Swiss-Prot record:
It comes from Thiobacillus denitrificans (strain ATCC 25259 / T1). It is an enzyme of class 3 (hydrolase). Phosphorylated by CheA. Phosphorylation of the N-terminal regulatory domain activates the methylesterase activity. This is Protein-glutamate methylesterase/protein-glutamine glutaminase. Residues 4-121 form the Response regulatory domain. One of its GO terms (molecular function) is phosphorelay response regulator activity. Residues 156-349 form the CheB-type methylesterase domain. Belongs to the CheB family. SUPFAM superfamilies: CheY-like, Methylesterase CheB, C-terminal domain. The gene is cheB. It comes from the Bacteria.
Length: 356
């Protein structure tokens, strides 16, 4: 059975290019195209698509307004098509909160040739979306307890020496938000790699910073890693943990993609294994593929403690599944339980926080 795709975009050019890309794939087909959400509503009823691609900025009805109604009334996998503007990236973050599975950026230059170069990327995103676990959205759909912040870390030594190292991909923006919102202001320092293109990581970090008790920023490289702070890999670089004297520091590296990704979760996890050893706790969240599994195993070998998100709470159970398969994890738990388990581990092992 081919994946049935409905394209919603006000640009005839983009609709044509997307149709060409999707119909060129052996395992998917376009069952309808709509210039606006009003037309899309009828086509959804008629064609019953498996995946919807949705332009974030459209006339007649705002793409976000349409997405919110869709997720409430007929939840389905949606891939947003977004412009590379600051406004576009902010709207995209909101769309992911509302339940879109993923997004793909519109290329800047000559749109048609640029889009055709995106063929593999777009096709991959649609394949992943078709397999994604879509949950009806309620105001607190995902977060179990994301509204509650956990109690402060009891052992001050713990929070200054221990680190939380997080990797995620598809579905990860919401999972990371739900995880970080539970952390207390004196939580150990956090380093995060989320697969996301340049231009979107800053909007994501700014959004998290407004929502969380800890401070969240896009890593610039050279920052001292502090308790109560989270550092997000920028879309153009790998993020690494390094040491300078007694301090943990961030480092950016624009080396080639690893596992087809830059930033790569494996790069971050490998650096944590090397630099922090048993002071690091690794957390692998929802995402497609195997990025992070090998690095998480290195963290385990170096004495770190690792947790994976369970299948039921993942949008895509790929990266956690691979990490579990190679024997890299110590615990597997639902998303809403992971922050508590991490902090409980630190509380129980605080006296062992040691410089390496």
């Amino acid at each position: 059975m081919k994946i049935k795709v409905l394209i919603v975009d006000d640009s005839a050019l983009i609709r044509g290019v997307m149709r060409e890309i999707i119909n060129s794939q052996p395992d998917m087909e376009v069952v309808g195209v709509a210039p606006d959400p009003i037309a899309a509503r009828e086509l959804i009823k008629q064609t019953n698509p498996d995946v919807l691609t949705l332009d974030v900025e459209m006339p007649k009805m705002d793409g976000l307004e349409f997405l919110e109604k869709l997720m409430r009334l007929r939840p389905m996998p949606v891939v947003m098509v977004s412009s590379l503007t600051e406004r576009g990236s902010e709207i995209t973050m909101r769309a992911l909160e509302l339940g879109a599975v993923d997004f793909v950026t519109k290329p800047k230059m000559s749109i048609q040739s640029g889009m055709l170069e995106y063929t593999d990327l777009i096709a991959d995103k649609i394949r992943i979306a078709a397999r994604a676990r879509i949950k009806p959205r309620t105001p607190h759909a995902q977060g179990g307890q994301s509204g509650t912040t956990l109690a402060a870390v009891r052992n001050p030594l713990t929070s200054s020496e221990k680190l939380i190292i997080i990797g995620a991909s598809t579905g990860g923006t919401e999972a990371i938000k739900d995880f970080l919102m539970q952390l207390p202001p004196d939580s150990p320092g956090v380093l995060i790699t989320q697969h996301m293109p340049e231009g979107f990581t800053r909007s994501f970090a700014n959004r998290l910073d407004k929502l969380c008790k800890i401070s969240v920023k896009e890593a610039e490289g050279g920052e001292r890693v502090l308790p109560g702070h989270a550092y997000l890999a920028p879309g153009h670089s790998h993020l690494l943990l390094v040491r300078s004297g007694a301090n943990y520091m961030t480092k950016l590296d624009q080396g080639p993609p690893v596992n087809r990704h830059r930033p790569s979760v494996d790069v971050l996890f490998n650096s944590a294994a090397l630099t922090a050893g048993k002071n690091a706790v690794g957390v692998i969240l929802t995402g497609m593929g195997k990025d992070g599994a090998a690095g998480m195993l290195e963290m385990k070998k170096a004495g770190g403690y690792n947790l994976a998100q369970d299948e039921a709470s993942c949008v895509v159970f790929g990266m956690p599944k691979e990490a579990i398969a190679v024997g890299a994890t110590h615990e597997v738990a639902p998303l809403h339980e992971l922050p508590r388990r991490v902090l409980e581990f630190f509380a129980a092992h605080g006296e062992r926080a040691m410089r390496v």
